[in-house]
């Protein structure tokens, strides 16, 4: 069941997002509206960081190795850009629907999405590096208006 939320790009509280991350780092800024003059809990804190650079950014990766359970992705695996660690995974699983190993994680916020798209990325599991690609959108592109 966990892979279904990952295929749809849904974050897991406690793994993919926690009090340590803000909405901008987690890629959830689309859920914040400043158009209405409504004071909500945390509004002033979010407004303070709205235009500041982010220290880390949430990403989705698919591995080029596409065997179920190989590698066994869990969380806290290092993410490499070439030979430098740039972040850590937060969740991982194999998608039987899409025949892909999928992992979520956070990487340095100063690396652009364009650079990540064209870069040689790797995820290290059990001392072995697996080639990975940035997944720009969720694998499952359902329209959730009916849910």
Identify the role of each PLM range:
Residues 1-147:
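Conserved, structured C-terminal
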């Amino acid at each position: 069941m966990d892979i279904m939320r990952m295929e749809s790009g849904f974050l897991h509280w406690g793994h993919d997002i926690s009090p340590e991350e803000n909405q901008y780092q987690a890629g959830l800024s689309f859920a914040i509206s400043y158009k209405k003059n409504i004071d909500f809990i945390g509004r002033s804190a979010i407004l303070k960081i709205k235009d500041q650079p982010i220290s880390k950014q949430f990403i989705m990766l698919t591995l080029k190795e596409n065997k179920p359970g190989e590698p066994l992705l869990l969380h806290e695996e290092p993410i490499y850009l070439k030979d430098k660690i740039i972040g850590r995974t937060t969740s991982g699983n194999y998608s039987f629907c899409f025949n892909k190993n999928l992992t979520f994680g956070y990487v340095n916020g100063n690396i652009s999405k364009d650079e990540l798209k064209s870069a040689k990325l790797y995820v290290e599991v059990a001392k072995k590096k697996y080639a990975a690609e940035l997944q720009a959108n969720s694998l499952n592109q359902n329209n959730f208006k009916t849910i």
